[in-house]
Amino acid sequence: MVDSYDDSLDGEKSKTQVKRELHALVDLGERLTTLKADVLAKLPLTDALRKALAEAPKHTANIARKRHILFIGKLMRDQDQEAILVLLDQLDASTRQYNERFHNLERWRDRLIAGDDADLEKFVIEYPDADRQQLRSLIRQAQHEVARNKPPATSRKIFKYIRELDELQRGLR
């Protein structure tokens, strides 16, 4: 016997594919519940979805939270998911960029505390607004703290100073 192939199903999505897409919408909705209000304000969302997202933190019981997340997923069907995903990707990229800059400043602090005058010179070249005398004093204090196993209070001051210089150089201050 020969099975006949029906061409009418070619354009339709399978049940599994539809379920995957719905789960993706629920996951996206759950991700939206973790965002702050100022970020949500930038997203193109309907009023019903904004209201549901605002109510999400009120649902603390597991089953109630799960039911509310599924409701948000249902509301996500009426949204422009591509625009939301693009904005969330931009947010993730800016977060990664911020984290990378933060880690770079931490590396500078560690190099200055552990290093010698060559590292200080490199830092002053990269950040010409740096007060060399103040920085040397902070570095010396931090090195004394490390030698005496004290809490790194001066190390935090150095990081704060480096961050202020970085923000000044980037025009953020």
Swiss-Prot record:
Subcellular location: Cytoplasm
Main localization (coarse): cytoplasm
Keywords, alphabetical: Cytoplasm, Ribosome biogenesis, RNA-binding, rRNA-binding
Molecular functions per Gene Ontology: ribosome binding; rRNA binding
GO cellular component: cytosol
GO biological process, one term: assembly of large subunit precursor of preribosome
Keyword rRNA-binding set for record: yes
Stored InterPro entries: DarP, DarP_sf
CDD domains the UniProt entry points to: YjgA-like
Entries under HAMAP family matching the protein: DarP (MF_00765)
Family membership: Belongs to the DarP family.
Function as written in the Swiss-Prot or TrEMBL entry: Member of a network of 50S ribosomal subunit biogenesis factors which assembles along the 30S-50S interface, preventing incorrect 23S rRNA structures from forming. Promotes peptidyl transferase center (PTC) maturation.
Name of the featured protein: Dual-action ribosomal maturation protein DarP
Source organism: Pseudomonas syringae pv. tomato (strain ATCC BAA-871 / DC3000)
Lineage: Bacteria, Pseudomonadati, Pseudomonadota, Gammaproteobacteria, Pseudomonadales
Gene that encodes it: darP
